[in-house]
Amino acid sequence: KYVQLGRPLRFYGGTASATEVGCNLRCKFCFSDKPVWKPKSTGRFYTPQQVFDGLSQSAQKHGYKLISASASEGTLGRQHLFELLDLVENSEYVYILETNGITLGADPEFAQALAKYKRLHVRVSIKGTSEDEYHELTGAMPSSYRLPFLGLGHLIDVGVSCNACVMVSFSN
């Protein structure tokens, strides 16, 4: 489910991005608003082909080689993601998968399934520097703090291009 397809972003030197709906965290600092907090009444469903076409049109218009979906959690609709990545694999683009890493950390097979995609880069967002800070920032169970780290390990183990993005709080 998406709010819009193909908006230009300045990140990574220019990216065409679709605005996703739905997340498994409720971060205090989240800018997404309705896509996260009101997913039932926000956006509409698109096929992977429609999403790819929207991203491709925006990327061509702005001269971008990178495409992504952001503003929510991109790993929740796994089959949709795989079908979208199949389309990207046969294109000139690189897909940036932005994720909080929870699903990847919980399921090593997910990372293995992503390993076949060579036009994929995964950006795992690490939220906080401790279990307590993570819980305070995301509302998630402190014990799930380890999952993004496990997800990064799973990705590295199977050779998926990836990096960590660390969000820290200076509130203490």
Model segments located where?
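N-terminal [4Fe-4S]-dependent radical SAM core
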Residues: K1-T19, K28, S32-K38
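"Short basic amphipathic alpha-helical interaction patches in structured regions
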Residues: F31-P35, R44, F82, T138-G139
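Pocket-edge positions in alpha/beta enzyme catalytic cores
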Residues: T15, K40-G43, A140
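Conserved alpha-helical substructure of the radical SAM core
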Residues: K34-I67
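Conserved AdoMet/S-adenosylmethionine-binding subsite of the radical SAM
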Residues: S56-L66, A71-N172
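Short connector loops/turns at beta-strand edges and beta->alpha or beta->beta junctions
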Residues: C23-N24, P35, I126-E131
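Generic hydrophobic, aliphatic-rich segments that mediate packing or membrane embedding
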Residues: G14, T19, C23-R26, T47, ...
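Short coil-to-beta-strand
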Residues: T19, C23-K28, K118-V124
